[in-house]
């Protein structure tokens, strides 16, 4: 079966396995092959691969990368995806971080459509970041790399908290939250929205504590009013009793929005949407579906 695909060049390493650009000899289409080696000691296919396959088979949407085929041999599993040669990180770098207001709005709408579709189907992505958002020739943005994706249909399941690249990780996960739902992706969307506006990651932390500190400085030190569940996470006591977290930071939010170039491209409505995405309390973050109906998307740029 894999002989149908002519491998051309290695284009990256995914959550696991190697990704190649290839040609489908039966259609002449360019495709991406994600190859996963199956170690003889291991029983069957890595669970991350099975998770990605089963999720993507269910998720058919224009803003989600298409899974075209799955080839399985004794030593290797090959997942065939539509080929997109550009991700949002590369796109931002190419434009020197300077996207115009209309492009930001367009990408943001695509991102939220993909995320809302996942959430409607009880699927969390859990690793949203610019490198996992692919851009087509037609400038459509699509969610890719579902290696960490997880169905959340069973309500009170404990998830592992080793998810989401640090910079796009919400404060509840930084404090060790093991039970979370769609708000984990919504926080990441907020971070990506800000990065599209300014060209720079909003919270580029070096470790969990530094990441949380950057969030505290930006949003202000939380209290039980703005974050009722803040003391209920596994690492709350440990982390929040450190001297640096006992300082009272005034929010830098309005100063940053007023002084960092790029935020003006969002308009007042875009800034309001950003604030609703980046709430401390997970249940108070706007949903992806509600975000699509936000006045920001009525703005004409």
Swiss-Prot record:
Q: Which domain of life is it from?
A: Eukaryota
The record's catalysed reaction(s) read: [DNA-directed RNA polymerase] + ATP = phospho-[DNA-directed RNA polymerase] + ADP + H(+)
Q: Name one GO cellular component term.
A: cytoplasm
Q: Which residues form a coiled coil?
A: none
Which keywords does this chain's UniProt record carry? ATP-binding, Kinase, Nucleotide-binding, Phosphoprotein, Serine/threonine-protein kinase, Transferase
Q: Which GO terms describe its molecular function?
A: ATP binding; cyclin-dependent protein serine/threonine kinase activity; RNA polymerase II CTD heptapeptide repeat kinase activity
Q: Which residue positions are annotated as catalytic?
A: 127
Q: Which residues carry this modification: Phosphothreonine?
A: 160
Instruction: Give the residues the record marks as binding ATP.
Output: 11-19, 34
Mind telling me which InterPro entries this protein's record contains?
A: CDK (IPR050108), Kinase-like_dom_sf (IPR011009), Prot_kinase_dom (IPR000719), Protein_kinase_ATP_BS (IPR017441), Ser/Thr_kinase_AS (IPR008271)
Quaternary data: Forms a stable but non-covalent complex with a regulatory subunit and with a cyclin.
Tell me the protein family, please.
Answer: Belongs to the protein kinase superfamily. CMGC Ser/Thr protein kinase family. CDC2/CDKX subfamily.
**Protein name, UniProt field:** Cell division protein kinase 2 homolog CRK1
The organism of origin for this protein: Leishmania mexicana
Phylogenetic placement of the source organism: Eukaryota, Discoba, Euglenozoa, Kinetoplastea, Metakinetoplastina
């Amino acid at each position: 079966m894999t002989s149908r695909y002519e491998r051309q060049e290695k284009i990256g390493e995914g959550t696991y396995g190697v990704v190649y650009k290839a040609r489908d000899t039966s259609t002449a289409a360019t495709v991406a092959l994600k190859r996963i080696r199956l170690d003889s000691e291991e029983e069957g296919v890595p669970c991350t691969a099975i998770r990605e396959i089963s999720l993507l088979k269910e998720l058919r949407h224009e803003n989600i990368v298409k899974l075209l085929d799955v080839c399985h041999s004794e030593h290797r599993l090959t997942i065939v995806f539509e080929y997109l040669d550009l991700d949002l990180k590369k796109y931002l770098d190419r434009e020197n971080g300077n996207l115009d207001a209309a492009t930001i709005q367009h990408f943001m709408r695509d991102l939220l459509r993909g995320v809302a579709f996942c959430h409607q189907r009880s699927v969390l992505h859990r690793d949203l970041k610019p490198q996992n958002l692919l851009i087509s020739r037609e400038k459509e943005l699509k969610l890719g790399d579902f290696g960490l994706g997880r169905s959340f249909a069973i309500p009170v399941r404990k998830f592992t908290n080793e998810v989401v690249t640090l910079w796009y990780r919400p404060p509840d996960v930084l404090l060790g939250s093991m039970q979370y739902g769609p708000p984990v992706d919504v926080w990441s969307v907020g971070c990506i929205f800000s990065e599209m506006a300014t060209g720079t990651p909003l919270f580029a932390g070096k470790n969990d504590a530094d990441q949380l500190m950057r969030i505290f400085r930006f949003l202000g030190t939380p209290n039980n009013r703005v974050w009722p569940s803040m003391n209920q996470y596994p690492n709350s006591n440990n982390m929040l009793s450190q001297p640096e977290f006992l300082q009272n930071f005034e929010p830098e939010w309005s100063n940053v929005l007023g002084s960092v170039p790029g935020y003006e491209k969002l308009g007042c409505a875009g800034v309001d949407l950003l604030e609703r995405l980046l709430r401390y309390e997970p249940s108070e973050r706007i949903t992806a579906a509600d975000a699509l109906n936000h006045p920001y998307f009525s703005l004409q740029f």
